[in-house]
Amino acid sequence: MRIVIEGCDGTGKTSVAKILADHYGCDVVHMTGDDPKDFDFYWQSLRKNNVVYDRNVLGELVYPYVFDRKKHLKDEQSDGIISFYKHKGVHFFVLTANEGICKARLMMRGNEDQRILSNIPYILAKFKALAFEYNIPEINTSQRSADRVAKEIIKVIEEKENKK
């Protein structure tokens, strides 16, 4: 079982990833800005089984603009990685929430990077566009608890698995 949870900061990815990992008996891998973010890194990460990824390749298509840095992947590389992940049965989900909720959640954390706070509308819009482009289920977490979101994801995964 491999699950990728993507989305804007403050949408509940980490909380949902932990619940899913407990449910499926998986590890959580939290990908961060310190990871290499190149083609080999994402390709090799697929070697791990029984994992819930808290962020993965989609973030590399969003955050270079936010942090004013060079992209580490070419568009065709990210397309290839996502296609291959899906071919291998990786379950992708994009979490969204309304802008105000994301900001409130991030403010409660404290110490959030100002570049993220000032770019929430862009980050949300970009993740929504990527979910549409890659046909990835999008779940709005604005009025849902992490438990409820995890249950929705489990239901989608079970329906997919039963179709095989």
Could you describe each region identified by the protein language model?
Residues 26-28, 52, 92-94, 136-138:
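Conserved beta-strand scaffold positions in the cores of enzyme catalytic domains, especially
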Residues 10-11, 57-59, 98-100, 144-146:
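Short, solvent-exposed loop/turn segments at secondary-structure junctions
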Residues 2:
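Walker A (P-loop) ATP-phosphate-binding motif of ABC ATPase nucleotide-binding domains
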